[in-house]
Structures are given as structure tokens and as C-alpha cells.
UniProtKB/Swiss-Prot annotation:
Keyword Glycoprotein belongs to the record: yes
Native species: African swine fever virus (isolate Portugal/Lis 57/1957)
Protein name: Protein MGF 110-7L
Top-level taxon of origin: Viruses
InterPro entries, per database record: ASFV_fam_110
Keyword Signal: yes
Record's signal peptide: 1-20
UniProt record similarity statement: Belongs to the asfaviruses V110 family.
UniProt-annotated glycosylation sites, renumbered to this chain: N69, N70, N105
Amino acid sequence: MLVIILGVIGLLASSNLVSSSTSTRVGGHLPLTFDPPENELGYWCTYVESCRFCWDCEDGICTSRVWGNNSTSIIENDYVKYCEVSRWGDLCRYDVEEHIYHSMNCSDPKPWNPYKIARKEWKKDKHFRKELKKDEF
């Protein structure tokens, strides 16, 4: 019985050490969510930038929630995906809408973007919003 208790205490202690060592980047545990904390968007969006929570989209044009108007705007299409993210200790995980999962060590993250081919940058001179007249509805 004592061995089991000591084992559980050891697991909890190692989990806390991992959490505290990564807390400067992402901090503690995070239950599965479509809406990570605002102060963590830079982290989550750096490694899987196609997640919808990384973008503010209006009228088919999306601007980065992390880098704002100073970044390239994109056209809203299949590139922008609904993602859920979670963190347990040093394991960060993305669950993308097609039941695709990407896991990584939070303290040693790696970019992952299989949807990059679908990304289309919006250029003001090339893509313009058409003003419709009443009879064009």
C-alpha cells in the first residue's frame, strides 16, 4: 500500500515539475477547448496557424488575431479549420475538425500545417469585395 501511495505522489510531483517548467510558455493544464486563453494564442497559433481561433474572419477575409493588421490577410476557405486544443503536463494536443490529431511536447514544439496548400493570401488589388446593386441579389 505504501508503495502505491509513494508512486502516486511521485507521479504528481513529476507532473508539477513539468507544468512549472513550461508555465512560462503556456502554464499548467488546459482542458479541451475551442477557445484557448487570449494570452496563449501566440503559442497555439505559431505551431498550427490554420486553427479558426487564430483568425478574425469577416466577409470572407481573415486577419490574424495574434499579429493583427500587420500580418497578411487570408481568404476564408478550407485552410481555416475548427480546432480544439488541450494541455496536460508537457503534452500539447490539437484536435482538428476532421478528427486529425497533432500532439507535441509543449516545451519542444514543432510547427505542423498539412493545410498550407489551401492557404490563399488576400491582396487588395487582386481580390476586391464586389458591391452588389439591388437588382443583383
